[in-house]
Design a protein with these regions (language model features):
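Long, charged amphipathic helices and adjacent flexible linkers at domain junctions
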Residues: 1-12
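Left-handed beta-helix
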Residues: 10-11, 16-17, 22-23, 28-29, ...
Length: 82
């Protein structure tokens, strides 16, 4: 995590190994981030399932279940299941 002071992570969030969280990220609710993901910068994820190998940049993901290896962004706003 390059700049931990610029990241907000709620207590119920789970993050896998070898995942990078970039500045300006907000992780809320029961969000699950898998292994080897790249999250941020400037991403908000709430109550979502982000499996292994996903990349998300400059986007908002709410109540969404992504597919393994998904690439999202920039400027996407996703809600509901894929």
């Amino acid at each position: 995590m390059p700049d931990p002071e610029s990241v907000y992570i709620e207590p119920d969030v789970r993050i896998g190994t070898d995942t990078t969280i970039y500045p300006g990220v907000t992780l809320l609710g029961k969000t699950r981030i898998g292994n080897r993901c790249h999250i941020g910068p400037q991403v908000k994820i709430a109550d979502a399932d982000v499996p292994e190998g996903c990349t998300i940049e400059f986007s908002v993901i709410e109540k969404r279940k992504l597919k393994k290896g998904s690439v999202i962004g920039p400027f996407a706003f996703l809600t509901g299941d894929l």
